[in-house]
């Protein structure tokens, strides 16, 4: 009998790590705003400077979130890959790290279309032409695809039941959580102040399909960790993160 334990845990992980990554990203904006005396106000997926600042101050605040996300994501992935044994903790850290890395590289993808987003504001301040931002977006897409294919090796440790069913496992590891993230995070993001705030929640999860595609082509996968029960810790963590996220609205 097929179980959905891996799928449910993966969905809980993706939702909770998406929220944690978003709050940390926005908190970096907030802290930068405080240091720049902009009297910022923290919300679930945006920060408002209540004090009118200079263009440079606004750009510095805008850049703080993506920069923090990249550094944080790389650190989490390094720790997970080097020191954490296969477990739900490792799977959690893998999703958290990859999602955080998208906090910069993913924003480069949408910069040509989101002029009011973090990278869009920075590009505008630096006077970067639209065609250059498109070139940067394409380069970012290629780099993300390379990294995410490389990190597919971090998903080979898990299976849904004693007898490894790769087709079912890859659905539970990737397909269910990717689409769940797109739908649930979009729903949790309302109300929105600008349409641009929905772009990351709708389009960035699609980058994980490169990880899925690489995993799908892998041969000789022999996972030894069966995940067929839902973690109560993940349930509580996901509920708490959703409460905090909605409180910040």
Predicted feature locations:
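Small-residue-rich helix-interface/hinge motifs
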Residues: 5, 13-63, 67
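N-terminal membrane topogenic signal
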Residues: 1-13, 169-172
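Metalloprotease/metallohydrolase-associated module, dominated by Zn2+-dependent proteases
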Residues: 43, 53-154, 170-184, 205-212
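Membrane-interface helix caps and helix-loop-helix hairpins in membrane proteins
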Residues: 58-59, 187-195
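A cytosolic-side transmembrane-helix exit/cap motif
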Residues: 110-115, 215-226
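Hydrophobic core segments of alpha-helical transmembrane domains in multi-pass membrane proteins
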Residues: 195-207
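Final/C-terminal transmembrane alpha-helix of multipass membrane proteins
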Residues: 15-17, 21, 226-249
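Membrane-interfacial, low-structure loops and terminal tails that flank and connect transmembrane helices
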Residues: 153-173, 219-227
